[in-house]
A protein has these predicted regions:
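Conserved phosphate-binding/catalytic loops in two-lobed NTP-binding clefts
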Residues: 1, 270-281
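Glycine-rich phosphate-binding loops at beta-strand->alpha-helix junctions
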Residues: 150-154, 251-270
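Phosphate/pyrophosphate-binding loops at sites that engage ATP/ADP/AMP, CoA/4′-phosphopantetheine
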Residues: 11, 234-253
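Nucleotide/phosphate-binding catalytic cleft detector across ATP-hydrolyzing
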Residues: 1-26
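A short acidic Gly-Thr/Ser loop motif
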Residues: 19-36, 40-43, 68, 258-260
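Adenine-nucleotide phosphate-binding core of ATP-dependent small-molecule kinases
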Residues: 208-240
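A short acidic (Asp/Glu
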Residues: 5-8, 37-39, 75, 262-269
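Phosphate-binding glycine-rich/basic clefts of nucleotide- and phosphate-handling proteins
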Residues: 39-200
C-alpha cells in the first residue's frame, strides 16, 4: 500500500488527479517466492493543508509458487548444463541448442501449450546433467551423509551463483555478458567468482570435489529468451480473465512492484493485455 501512496503523491505533484473522481489501480508485486495481484479504488479530497485519500482494496489473484526465485532457478538450470558440457559430457544438449528450440513465438506457444511444455526440453537436458553434476539432494537422503551434503552444497552453490548472474544482468550494471569462473587471476569485467572446492562431480561411482570448474559465459539475450516464458506465464495467469471480461479497462494504471518486476520482460508481457502507457514501475 505504501507503493500506491507514493504513486498518488507523484500524481498529485504532476496535477493528473481530479478531486472526488474515482480511480482504480492494479498492483502486481513479485517477491522472492510469491507474486500477488491486488486492486485499489481511490479518490482524493483537497483539504488545503493536506489531501484526504479514500481507498478500498481487494485481493484479486496470487501465486505462492512463483517469484524471483523461479527466475534464478531457470538461470541455475542453464548454468548447470553449461558446466556439464564444459566438463565434457556431450550427451547433454548445449545451451545454444536448448535456446534455439525455445526461440519461437513464445507468447503464442504458451497460449496454446502452456509454460510447462515450453520448458520441457530444458527440463529433459537438466535431468541428463544430473548424471554428471547432481543437485537433487532430496534424492540422496537415504545415501550416506557425506554424499547428501555434497549434493546439497552443489544446489546452493549453483543457485547463489545464478542469483549473482541475475543481478548483473538486471541490476544497475546492466551487463550484456557475464563470465563464471573459479580463477581469480585475469578476471574480465562482470565476472562471477565460483569458489574453488565447492562443486562435486560424479567420477565413476563416487562424488568427487573438484578444485576448479571450467569457465563458462552467458549473455543477456540468452537470459532474456530463457526467462520470457516464466514471466509471460505469470502475467497471462493474472491478466487473461481481466482482459477477456473487459474489466481491465476499468483501471487507470497498473503498477509493478518488487525487485523482479524491474525486469523489462514484465512490461513487455503486460503489453499483450494493456497499452504500455498504463504501466508504471
Amino acid at each position: 500500500m505504501a507503493v500506491l501512496y507514493n504513486t498518488i503523491s507523484n500524481m498529485l505533484e504532476q496535477e493528473t488527479l481530479e478531486e472526488n473522481e474515482e480511480y482504480e489501480a492494479l498492483i502486481i508485486d513479485c517477491g522472492g517466492g510469491t507474486t500477488d495481484l491486488c486492486s485499489y479504488r481511490f479518490r482524493i479530497q483537497d483539504r488545503r493543508a493536506a489531501y484526504k485519500i479514500y481507498m478500498e482494496t481487494a485481493y484479486e489473484n496470487g501465486d505462492t509458487d512463483f517469484g524471483g526465485n523461479n527466475l534464478t532457478y531457470r538461470i541455475m538450470q542453464i548454468l548447470k548444463i553449461a558446466l556439464v558440457r564444459a566438463k565434457g559430457n556431450q550427451n547433454v544438449s548445449s545451451v545454444k541448442e536448448i535456446l534455439e528450440y525455445m526461440d519461437t513465438d513464445i507468447y503464442r506457444f504458451i497460449d496454446s501449450h502452456g509454460v510447462k511444455e515450453f520448458y520441457q526440453y530444458l527440463e529433459q537436458e537438466y535431468q541428463k546433467a544430473e548424471e554428471t553434476l547432481p543437485t537433487r539432494f532430496a534424492d540422496f537422503e537415504r545415501y550416506n551423509r557425506s554424499e547428501y551434503y555434497k549434493v546439497k552444497n552443489n544446489f546452493y552453490t549453483l543457485f547463489n551463483t545464478a542469483e549473482q548472474i541475475k543481478k548483473l544482468f538486471y541490476g544497475k550494471v546492466g551487463a550484456l555478458e557475464v563470465t563464471v569462473t573459479s580463477e581469480q587471476k585475469g578476471q574480465r569485467e562482470n565476472t562471477v567468482l565460483l569458489d574453488k572446492w565447492k562443486l562435486s562431480f560424479w567420477k565413476g561411482d563416487s562424488l568427487t570435489v573438484e578444485k576448479t570448474v571450467p569457465e563458462v559465459m552467458m549473455n543477456y539475450f540468452e537470459i532474456e529468451l530463457l526467462l520470457s516464458g516464466e514471466i509471460y506465464g505469470i502475467v497471462q495467469k493474472f491478466m487473461e480473465e481481466l482482459y477477456h471480461s473487459g474489466r481491465i479497462q476499468d483501471f487507470s494504471f497498473i503498477k509493478l512492484t518488487g525487485q523482479s518486476c524491474k525486469i523489462d520482460l514484465f512490461k513487455d508481457a503486460l503489453k499483450e493485455f494493456v497499452p504500455g502507457r498504463m504501466i508504471q514501475f
